[in-house]
């Protein structure tokens, strides 16, 4: 999934020097954060949200190393403030449960659509959502607490599998935490209590339960 990566404008304009021809006061390369982000997004761009990575340990290691670079860049930032509130759309993960549902959806005559994390920091709510267009959805409701500048604790409180004219409540199951090791206006990179990784972008819409 392509994301637009903005480069800072170069100023002043190009000027000729005696020794080196044209020169500019800004680098033709992006800054370190932009380079690391671009590399990470390129690495995951053909990985089918992580399905292909499961069968390619070398590629997984490359992606994890790129995530570690993003972790260093984001280590002093606050990633649990109001800017965390958003509908986040899955780009890539190592989480086996999510990947299993995405991969096996065809066995039930459907395909997985967007996979989302819907977070509201002020209301202390997290919904994990897997959509099955046009009418199906599986979502897990959770309560959250902000534990640190980058860590969020969560506790599942209910789950629902819903179709067009039916709904199947499921029992809640467990608790844990995740750390947002990097976040900006476009993407978020997280690592959870089990050592799984998640890369998401800000969806172009806000998901609510009224969508289904």
From Swiss-Prot:
Its main location: plastid. The keyword Ion transport does not apply. It is found in: Plastid, Chloroplast thylakoid. The keyword ATP-binding does not apply. Pfam families: PAP_fibrillin. Keywords: Chloroplast, Plastid, Thylakoid, Transit peptide. Residues 1-25 form a transit peptide. GO terms for cellular component: chloroplast thylakoid. Belongs to the PAP/fibrillin family. This is Probable plastid-lipid-associated protein 11, chloroplastic. It comes from Arabidopsis thaliana.
């Amino acid at each position: 999934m392509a994301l637009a990566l903005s480069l800072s404008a170069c100023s002043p304009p190009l000027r000729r020097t005696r020794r080196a021809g044209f020169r500019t006061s800004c680098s033709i390369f992006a800054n370190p954060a932009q380079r690391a982000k671009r590399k990470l997004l390129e690495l995951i761009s053909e990985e089918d949200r992580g399905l292909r990575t499961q069968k390619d340990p070398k590629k997984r290691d490359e992606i994890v190393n790129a995530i570690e670079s993003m972790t260093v860049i984001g280590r002093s930032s606050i990633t649990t403030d109001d800017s965390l509130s958003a509908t986040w759309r899955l780009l890539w993960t190592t989480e086996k449960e999510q990947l299993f549902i995405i991969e096996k959806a065809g066995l039930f005559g459907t395909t997985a659509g967007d996979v989302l994390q819907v977070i509201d920091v002020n209301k202390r709510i997290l919904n994990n959502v897997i959509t099955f267009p046009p009418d199906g959805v599986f979502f897990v409701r959770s309560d959250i607490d902000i534990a640190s500048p980058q860590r969020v604790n969560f506790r599942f409180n209910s789950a629902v599998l819903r179709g067009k004219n039916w709904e199947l409540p499921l029992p809640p199951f467990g608790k844990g935490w995740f750390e947002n090791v990097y976040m900006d206006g476009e993407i978020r990179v997280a690592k959870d209590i089990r050592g799984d990784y998640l890369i998401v972008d800000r969806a172009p819409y806000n998901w609510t339960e009224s969508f289904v």
